[in-house]
Amino acid sequence: MAGTGIIAIAAAIAAFTGIGAGIGISLATGKAVEGIARQPEAAGSIRTSLLLGAALAEATAIYGLVVALVLVFLKM
């Protein structure tokens, strides 16, 4: 039974990757909006870089969620 508590804590820590991804994506979006406001002609390039970065940041959140679900439901 002691292992169940440790698994719950590990799953909670893994689920917190969503917070980091959210903060990272919001900071990147803010800087992209600033960049587009300063140089509207570079909007396409900035938007492409933003989408690539946001996808990579969101992938870490998805991996964290998968790890948390595996820990909770499979009780490794």
Swiss-Prot record:
InterPro entries: ATP_synth_csu_bac/chlpt (IPR005953), ATP_synth_F0_csu (IPR000454), ATP_synth_F0_csu_DDCD_BS (IPR020537), ATP_synth_F0_csu_sf (IPR038662), ATPase_proteolipid_c-like_dom (IPR002379), F/V-ATP_Csub_sf (IPR035921). The record marks 58 as: Reversibly protonated during proton transport. The keyword Isomerase does not apply. PROSITE patterns: ATPASE_C (PS00605). CDD domains: ATP-synt_Fo_c. It holds the Pfam family ATP-synt_C. It is found in: Cell membrane. The chain crosses the membrane at residues 5-25, 54-74. Keywords: ATP synthesis, Cell membrane, CF(0), Hydrogen ion transport, Ion transport, Lipid-binding, Membrane, Transmembrane, Transmembrane helix, Transport. Belongs to the ATPase C chain family. HAMAP family: ATP_synth_c_bact (MF_01396). F-type ATPases have 2 components, F(1) - the catalytic core - and F(0) - the membrane proton channel. F(1) has five subunits: alpha(3), beta(3), gamma(1), delta(1), epsilon(1). F(0) has three main subunits: a(1), b(2) and c(10-14). The alpha and beta chains form an alternating ring which encloses part of the gamma chain. F(1) is attached to F(0) by a central stalk formed by the gamma and epsilon chains, while a peripheral stalk is formed by the delta and b chains. This is ATP synthase subunit c. It comes from Ruminiclostridium cellulolyticum (strain ATCC 35319 / DSM 5812 / JCM 6584 / H10) (Clostridium cellulolyticum).
